[in-house]
Amino acid sequence: MQVFVFDNTLDGLLTAVFDSFFLKQQPEYLLAEGDQLPLFADEPHHVVTDSEHAERVWKGLEKHLSKEGLHMISVSWLSEERTLNQPLFNFICKVFRTKVKELERNASDPDVLEVRNSCRRVMHEQLRMKQFIRFQKAKDGTYLAVISPDHNVLPLIIDHFQDRFNDQPWLIYDAHRHYGYYYDGSAISRSEERFSRNAETDL
């Protein structure tokens, strides 16, 4: 029983796909570091994340998938669902092995279906966040919003709020993942510290 273990990053998963073809192995399990190995598993292959290998795999996907298919992969990854690792890995491997055009549209494939459904869950939540996020004004004039979404949707909603509130400073902070994005009126930057400072002195 072949097992691959990776660092639970998207580059790590793409590197695992590269290793699968390079080693000519199709693992029955793709596990994140820290996951329990199944009984009777062979010595696991530990994937060493390689950005160049990951980039090669992604460029290959760009040749075989539509924009919708690439979108499915990118967005579903933001779900942070551990159960997605295996079907997403399987789906990407099938893209290269089968060379079926628009494989991402084959809803009868269980791996494709799982990736597609995960993508839909993330997109549904990001839409809900856009509709229901509410800001509070801090003493320094910054508008603050704290969210705790099930999925890592913050990267998907930032452009929306930059377009909508482009004339005032604001910070949207994900309390579950301990990071946020700060807009100073001209540019957006990722922030881990600004919220804690505002929370202590301004609110």
Model regions: which residues?
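Conserved small/polar residues in nucleotide/adenosyl-binding loops
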Residues: 193-199
